Amino acid sequence: VCALIKGNKADNGRVIGVRADIDALPLEDKKKCSYASKIKGKMHGCGHDGHTSILLGIAKLINNNRDIFGGTVKLMFEPAEETTGGAKVMIEEGILKNPHVDVVYGLHMEETIDTGTIMVKKGTVNAASNPFKIVVKGEGAHGAYPAAAVDPIVVSSQIIMALQTIVSREINPSNPAVVTVGSIHGGTASNIIPDEVEIGGIIRTMTKEDREHSVKRVKEIAEGIARSLRAECQVEIEESYPCLINNDELVERLRQNAEKVIGKENVLEQKNPKMGVESFAYFASEVPSVFYFLGCRNVEKGIIHPAHSSLFDIDEESLPIGIAIGCEFIVDYLTSC
């Protein structure tokens, strides 16, 4: 979903994209409030309803004040952020063209900081990710006669342990990185050695070099260990979300705009990149972009639960703050020399 708002002043050729993700999660909403999900097994457990509300609020105010700016605001509502990353498809289908988008602005609700504050960072904000699947193929046999088998469970266990050396022994310790194995499936009974085991995991890195190295080494380690233990191995590694990297100049502009709304003391510095991924990174890979975190925690109201939890909630008082900062940034960008 996309919409354009054009200013009534002389067109300066500037176009700013403002993005909100709109999808929900496959969770049962256990909140006790008027806006809890009415659809069984589906809820807004990551604040995307807040993002959408903020963008709609920005749209209303910007549209009602077109006389104060020239240029164009492109409203971009992104589906499938939690799954395949809708931003990638939107870009492929031309969301950043006709008219060409010069910069993109976005935010995310942040339940670890209080309403009335924001958190922003120059440079890398979120990690890149590469999900992987490893299928180890051996030869099954009776559990009493392991010499008659090529045991894929033993092979898989060695692969899993060896993968941890990528981060601990091959990545610069100054660069955060993670290789996580989250699933392993194989076997049907305690006395049967299976033919096959499937391993599922994900790589998370902060630099292009670490990403390329980790992807290469997962494949080399898995195939090498399997071969040395007489097994076969198939490795599939997906090219998923890139690192989200903020534009330094836009971060400075955002800080100044946010300080006008909430005060300098409430504009917090994000000290370290987040290991989670964010599909806004696709936009930031194409054009200069800025992405920040909007505080939505309120201890007095009991709004303290983490994202992707069935009790996740946002303090609604954070919404007008997000709208005000967004409008301040947009108008400043479109009216500055």
Where are these predicted regions, by residue range?
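Hydrophobic/aromatic beta-strand patches that form the interior of the parallel beta-sheet core
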Residues: I16, V103-Y105, V290-Y292
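Metal-dependent amide/peptide-bond hydrolase catalytic core
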Residues: V154-C337
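Histidine/acidic-residue-rich, glycine-tolerant segments that coordinate divalent metal ions
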Residues: L25-L27, K31-M43, D49-G50, D67-P194, ...
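Divalent metal-coordination and catalytic microenvironments
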Residues: A3, V18, H48, L75, ...
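Non-cysteine beta-strand/loop elements that form the S-adenosyl-L-methionine
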Residues: R19, F132-I134, F291-C296
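Acidic/His- and Gly-rich active-site-bordering loop/insert found
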Residues: V1-H44, S53-L56, K60-F69
